[in-house]
Amino acid sequence: ITFSKIYRSCKSNSVCGNQKCVRGRCV
């Protein structure tokens, strides 16, 4: 089972593109 890309793990905002890294997830 895979979660939506919205909740992919991250360590910085740059990983999320136009999203922000919050609590290790892109939102």
Curated annotation (Swiss-Prot):
Transmembrane segments: none annotated. Not toxic to mice by intracerebroventricular injection. It comes from Ctenus ornatus. GO terms for cellular component: extracellular region. Belongs to the u18-CNTX family. Expressed by the venom gland. This is U18-ctenitoxin-Co1b. Keywords: Secreted. Its main location: secreted.
